[in-house]
Amino acid sequence: MSYLFSSESVSEGHPDKVADQISDAILDQFLAYDEKARVACESFVTTGQVVIMGEVSSRVYIDLQTIARNTIKRIGYTKAEYQFDGNSCGILSAIHEQSGDINRGVDRENEDEQGAGDQGMMFGYATNETDNYMPVSLDLAHLIMSTLAEIRKEGKLMTYLRPDSKSQVTVQYSDDNIPERIDTIVVSTQHDEFADDDTMLAKIREDVINILMPRVKGKITNDNVLKLFGDDIKYYVNPTGKFVIGGPHGDTGLTGRKIIVDTYGGKGAHGGGAFSGKDSSKVDRSAAYAARHIAKNMVAAGVADEMLVQISYAIGVARPMNIYVNTYGRSNVDMTDGEIAKKIEKLFDLRPKAIERTLKLRQPIFSETAAYGHMGRKPEIKKKTFTSHYHETKTIDV
């Protein structure tokens, strides 16, 4: 029997994502000037105010205020009427040095034996539903949000858009787990004041269906995904009505509160650890990336149509406690899931330092992951320019 499955995404202007982006921008700034920096940076955003908290060990000083303000303005919070404006919001820093107890437990004479920065379990997931091996419901929800932000920043169409928005996509699956059709699309977007509420709702709905969705479909190159779009999709556009008050003024935002949006949209599993603001010595982030790297490559190689990989660590210990694999009965090789896990253990070095080297996680690459998902991204080389507290500028290919 067929079933329905939903995933949501949020825009870069969602308050929790504003916090994530500030935290990762600060992390990148540290890594640009000190690749050995240890960073655990949390951000809190609310009406007219940002608080930056956490623990850092680094040989460099960075201008937290400028980084936070530039991030907020890039997102689009540039008007006083939003009650949260990158030019005028208050910014308080409560950053302090990382615990010496943790440093002693993690650092080793032999760098390769660097211990995990914490205990925990991390998951990676992949499916062959899409070209980037992500669940199609989440992939579409992200695409809707990133395209809406693109339209907003162009400033030519849907000129009433404000930065905060959310999407949700419900997909119908066959009983053998094949996507069949899109059942429902939900889009809620912050907007300017309208003279009349009924006019507002009608206009936004019309523009979502006639401007946003055609552009979204135009970006999809996979015919199997395009076939999911039928004439019977149910659209819910701003279903609560007026959405003028939004962003950090409407809801307080915190780093690390969108971990399902950041990963697999409810598919697979999640170990509970957030990513943004953490350098790669924190296995919450680096091992989750490694688990995804393994799952994706296993599915891409045809080992299974779908795979979940779990890795767990003890603080201060380099090698993982376990590797677990679940192929959901969709394996294409004559091996049990346990045998696949044993093979993975031999093929991949999952010590934290080895993960850093393999995935190049000591580069300032994290700001790009802080909105629209950490997984399923297209590899690219990008030039990034950083300016130090002493006005020294450097450009890095990452």
Label for each model-derived stretch:
Residues S6, T66, K73-V244, A371, ...:
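Glycine-rich, mobile lid/loop segments that gate access to catalytic sites or pores
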Residues D196-M298:
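Glycine-rich anion/phosphate-binding loop at the beta-strand->alpha-helix junction
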Residues E12-L31, E129-E150, K278-G302:
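Alpha-helical support elements that line or immediately flank enzyme active sites
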Residues T46, A304-E306, Y313-V398:
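Internal helix-turn-beta structural module
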Residues A37-C41, S165-V171, I233-V237, V303-A314:
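A short glycine-rich, hydrophobically flanked beta-strand micro-motif that places a catalytic Asp/Glu
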Residues M1-A40, V45:
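N-terminal, positively charged regions that mediate nucleic acid binding
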Residues E8-V10, H14-A19, G115-T130, V244-A269, ...:
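Conserved phosphate/anionic-ligand binding catalytic regions in large, soluble enzymes, centered on
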Residues A40-S58, I315-R319:
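Short, charge-patterned binding micro-sites
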